[in-house]
Amino acid sequence: QVCIADDISLRGPRLTEQRSAGQGSCASATADLCVHGDWGRKCPNGCRMQGLMSHAEKDIGKRIGDLTERLARLGRLYTQVHTDFRAVSDTSGQTLNEHNELEVRYSEVLRELERRIIHLQRRINMQLQQLTLLQHNIKTQVSQILRVEVDIDVALRTCKGSCARYLEYRLDKEKNLQLEKAASYIANLKFERFEEVVVEETLNRRVETSSHAFQPTHGQGTPQPGHGTHSLSATSSITSAPNFVPHRQPTYVDHGRLSNPNEVAHSASSSSTHTSSSSSPSQPVSRDSAFPLPGSNTGTSEWDFNFHDESTPGNGPRDEAAASSSAHSPSTASHDTATSTTSFSSGTSGKDVAPLGTGVTHDGGVRTSGSLMDGGSSDTGTGGVSKTTTFTGSAQGGSWSTGGSTATNTGSAQGGSWSTGGRTEPNTGSGQGGSWGTGGRTEPNTGSGQGGSWGTGGRTEPNTGSGQGGSWGTGGRTEPNTGSAQGGSWGTGGRTEPNTGSAQGGSWGTGGRTEPNTGSAQGGSWSTGGRTEPNTGSAKGGSWGTGGRTEPNTGSAKGGSWSTGGRTEPNTGSAKGGSWGTGGRTEPNTGSAQGGSWGTGGRTEPNTGSAQGGSWGTGGRTEPNTGSAQGGSWGTGGRTEPNTGSAQGGSWGTGGRTEPNTGSAQGGSWSTGGRTEPNTGSGQGGSWGTGGRTEPNTGSGQGGSWSTGGRTEPNTGSGQGGSWGTGGRTEPNTGSAQGGSWGTGGRTEPNTGSAQGGSWGTGGSTATNTGSAQGGGGYAAGGTGAQTGSGSTSTHSAHSASGGMSSLDMLPALPDFGTWDMPDHSDIFSRRRVSTSSTTSSSSGGGHAGAAAGGGGDGASRFGSLFTTDFGPEFHEEFRSMLPGASRLSSSSSSSTRSTSSTSGGKVVTESVVTKVLSNGTTITHHTKHVSTSDGTGAASDGVSPLLTGRKTKAARSRRAKATRP
């Protein structure tokens, strides 16, 4: 339908679209957009443009929303993955750390296993060497038996026609043949020795195989191949190693006829100076060349006995032994030493020497299991084990070495220097005790002074120290310890830094410390636990810390300052005893006076006390105890903190104590029960501990310090009585003062001491005891020699193996006075000694001639040593002049004893006069005055000088004048 307008214009009517109801809204979204030529009916309006724009905006917004959601989802996924990765990384790191620790432990166990294998190898080698020596001895003895039988038969046949009585004697040729075959069989047994191989210290260890089947082969055959041992190889026979010729190689010479002059020349050359190495070893001198047995492979089939009696003067073995000891005997001016591949210098002052390995005690020296007591230098080894070099020493004791040492030890002074174990470098030291080392050390120890320096364990760096005790280290230390003074410095555990200290006690550290401890004065400074900072202190006792302390303790005065527990601040104090804190204290304790101040339990305030005895606490006290009086301080029950006191009685604790006791005064300090910390005390009685102690005891004063039970650490003390230990000790005892130091039980390390009485050891000791001062050197009993001079009634024999008489400037052989029961007093032959023994008339340990007054041990071990006690050179000359032909003096001469006792002022005065008249007219008088308290608290000398005098009769002087005429 077409609409016609009412008004007709010039253009005429136009067609118009019929509007619908929805034409008022925007155009459809499907309508096309306008172009330039489409304006008019086809062009959409603005409403349509608005719709298109809104549609596009929604589409773009939806896409942006999808991207945002995806981004958030990826973020959450990243967080989860990162968390899982961190967890896996932590677990892997922990596993790697554990694996690394296992590798380190494996390496340590491997090194320890190698060390033990090498130790076993060396012991096996020493045993094989001893077996070789025993083979040689058996063959020699069999040849001597056969020779003696033939000599007896010849002598009886010669006497048959001229003797009044004739004994029918027939040779049992069948038994002799069996004996000869058995000896030949034993002599032909060949043992292969291990040869040590050095391996690199890495996990990729070089494995060496061994052809050692560890079974003997017969004849001259080769050993059967076998599987080897880790890092060990055996390629050389015992016959190609440095051979071990006995010290007294007999020379069998018939001056009438000489079947083979080269044999005598070869035998004589074995006692001359000779040095060999493993590359060009020297063969042992075979006695088969002088005594070819029937059926043997060497020599002729006839018995050709060239024998020279040992008692005949000339080139016999006695002269060889005398020549070997000429450099060390005071009665011989010659310094020629007789050394071979093995140089056995006995220091016997011209006495007879039995073959090695027999355990025979010799006059002037003990030599058993490689232990040489007194007399110059030696190269004995263990049980006759030889070395390849000569050890030289000068002075009382000289120097020597035991084990597989291949280098020279040199020392001068009393004790010199020595080494034990697999040392390959020399030890050098001068002074009383010198220096030495034990274990697998490969670097030298150098020290001067009483005790010098030494090291134990797997140390690879030298220890250097000067003074009484010097310095040393134990454990896996790899850095040197340096110290000077009495005690010096040392370290235990896994320390890798040096300890330096000077004064009595010096400084040391225990545990995992990595920084040095430095201190000066008596006691110095030290630390225990996980400390990483140094402790510094000066004065008697110095300063130290225990537990998790990370800051230094500093103190000056007797006792200084220290701390226990979780303290993080220093303690400072001055005075006798100083100050310290225990438990969870965070503030310092300060006190001055004898005893100082301290705290127990959970105290947070200081305790202060002054007076004799100081203060103490018992049980669960939280308030301070303060007291003054004679008796000091102590605690009983379940105390876990230290007791400290000063005064008569000192301090001590009983029960389950785990902390140290410290005290000074008469009685010192000690502890019983399951103590695991050290006791320290100074004064009469010193300090000691009983039970399962594992830490050292240190004390100074009359009685020193000692320990009983399963101690494994050294005891150190100075004063009358020195220090010693009993039980299963494996470390050395060192002490200086009257009585020296010694050890009993299964000791395997040396004892060193200086002062009246020297030092010695009893039990199964296998190392050397050395002592200097009145009483000479030391000795060992229980397998290495005879022990004399112990107890209040002593047996003094001129043929004792102890005492170091070769170091005295007296006669080579002292008179045999027989068994002489001396008066029961320890202060005989000592001037102005003060005895602190708990008995009224005699000291514990007894002994005479230089014995300590306060439990001073056995004292000088030979009767002749008493002549060195404060008498001077005039008495020496007088005594030497009154004993011509001393060894021929009779011990059956008459003697008389007169004793008087009186009581005055609470004191018991006992005077004893012992007079002995020898067979040559010599009169020896012993006059002793002993003053002791009547209450049994102790015995004290009144300072009476010994009146040992030698009165020569007219007949004795006449005999001496005749003896001295040309």
UniProtKB/Swiss-Prot annotation:
**What GO terms are given for molecular function?**
extracellular matrix structural constituent; protein-macromolecule adaptor activity; signaling receptor binding
* UniProt biased composition (Basic residues): 951-966
Q: What is its main location?
A: secreted
Q: Name one GO biological process term.
A: fibrinolysis
Residue ranges with Gly residues bias = 430-440, 448-458, 466-476, 485-494, 503-512, 539-548, 575-584, 593-602, 611-620, 629-638, 647-656, 682-692, 718-728, 737-746, 755-764, 773-788, 844-857
The job of this chain, per UniProt, is described as: Fibrinogen has a double function: yielding monomers that polymerize into fibrin and acting as a cofactor in platelet aggregation.
Give the protein's recorded name: Fibrinogen alpha-1 chain
**Organism in which the protein naturally occurs:** Petromyzon marinus (Sea lamprey)
